[in-house]
Amino acid sequence: MPSDIEIARAATLKPIAQVAERIGIPDEALHNYGKHIAKIDHGFIKSLEGKPEGKLVLVTAISPTPAGEGKTTTTVGLGDALNRIGQRAVMCLREPSLGPCFGMKGGAAGGGKAQVVPMEQINLHFTGDFHAITSAHSLAAALIDNHVYWANELNIDVRRIHWRRVVDMNDRALRAINQSLGGVANGFPREDGFDITVASEVMAVFCLARDLADLEERLGRIVIAETRDRKPVTLADVKATGAMTVLLKDALQPNLVQTLEGNPALIHGGPFANIAHGCNSVIATQTGLRLADYVVTEAGFGADLGAEKFIDIKCRQTGLKPSAVVIVATVRALKMHGGVNKKDLQGENLDALEKGFANLERHVKNVRGFGLPVVVGVNHFFQDTDAEHAKLKELCRDRLQVEAITCKHWAEGGAGAEELAQAVVKLAEGEQKPLTFAYDTETKLTDKIKAIATKLYGAADIQIESKAATKLAGFEKDGYGHLPICMAKTQYSFSTDPTLMGAPSGHLVSVRDVRLSAGAGFVVAICGEIMTMPGLPKVPAADTIRLDANGQIDGLF
């Protein structure tokens, strides 16, 4: 079968105005970026307020492995399949970050015959949203240091400036730096560092804001430093919010593209789920719900990260509620969770599959614990055997009383996911329970962290380092104790040890640091060795990305 980029390049794309027309977006509401990409105007989005909303379907997954799960591919395939069976469906996805595109993970536009296109533009600069977010964050950093340089009227303690810088790249060399060296004209030297743009609080605010006014208000709440008498300093205090909102004004308009089958997809915002809250923008999700019968959206990595944050942060703040949840699993990945090495995955191994099933089992039980109906989508690979798929379906039926459906959308497009689409509609139109959360926000911050660790991760307890404990106490003293928790931890395990696969229990979740995201409305708990600035692998994807003799991109995946 051709590569993803070859399939995408061979597709005949519809003019974006035709795609928009299918869901009731008039041509005058589009800001076109070429023939096949457009932004949807703020005014049109506001005109949709009060309209009936469709049903929301959340796609999540088992704990990811290098074998690959295909969550975005399944999201696209399911959206195409829903359209094929007569439902008006829109997909809502996150924008890819340049860091993983040139690192290990690759792009985030789906795969095979279940892709969003134009794939190359989406995976690279797209409409410049990440550039705008990086620029707004960098403007804030410049204004903070400028305020300190010119008399420091706010009495900012330069030892307690929390606002790090960002760049949309994996670059471990920038994790910790010394800035303002070279003499008094360059400011006050201090330690600083960079995070990847998707970990910026500006990205989180961008994705949780309801409109421009809410965006500016949230930006103003961001705590960037402390005074010498330990009082919080916000971006509003340094008068950064107006200019930052101007930089983000156009970016806040959702991006409209299409699938290979010509169905509409909104791609907007892109926080990672291991170091941020992992969901696309609220504006895109709510716009889709007011235009379609079904919105299919994804939450990053496994259900312990993306889905938990989707519910405990995004749904809690907005009132959204999924009508159905799809948990994506693969035979290959479950065998890895059962102890099989990646190079040995080709052969049939029912014992390893059953052992690795514990990972899927916990994810299903966790999602059901939120009161949500679940179906398992088994993403089919050519190397899978019929016996393995039969075994997995049997395990789901007997142990969990949940339906598992084999999906072949990667090879067949929407036609390969029609059975999954029918199951999703049945769940979404069936009995719905009230949404429940993993914790009560009025409990202490440490208790909320412990609730996530013990209820969802299978941990025995949490271990909070003294520095983090002191900061948590300070957050509560300053009035932020009511905020929900955003766990930053490895995506590869329920624990904080990425090598501990399957469904470990009885472990300790180590919290080494915490960060306040007052504008986004949560507290980030940084667990284990997770980094908010990733590094490149030994052999990065960038090594094989180039232009061919015809000026076309080769090696992007």
Swiss-Prot record:
InterPro entries, per the entry: Formate_THF_ligase, Formate_THF_ligase_CS, P-loop_NTPase
UniProt xrefs under Gene3D superfamilies: Domain 2, N(10)-formyltetrahydrofolate synthetase, Formyltetrahydrofolate synthetase, domain 3, P-loop containing nucleotide triphosphate hydrolases
HAMAP family per UniProt: FTHFS
Enzyme Commission code: 6.3.4.3
SUPFAM superfamilies reported for this sequence: P-loop containing nucleoside triphosphate hydrolases (SSF52540)
Family recorded in the similarity comment: Belongs to the formate--tetrahydrofolate ligase family.
Coiled coil feature spans: none
Keywords of the record: ATP-binding, Ligase, Nucleotide-binding, One-carbon metabolism
This protein's pathway: One-carbon metabolism; tetrahydrofolate interconversion
Enzymatic reactions: (6S)-5,6,7,8-tetrahydrofolate + formate + ATP = (6R)-10-formyltetrahydrofolate + ADP + phosphate
Protein name: Formate--tetrahydrofolate ligase
Pfam families: FTHFS (PF01268)
Binding positions (ATP): 65-72
GO biological process: tetrahydrofolate interconversion
GO MF, one example: formate-tetrahydrofolate ligase activity
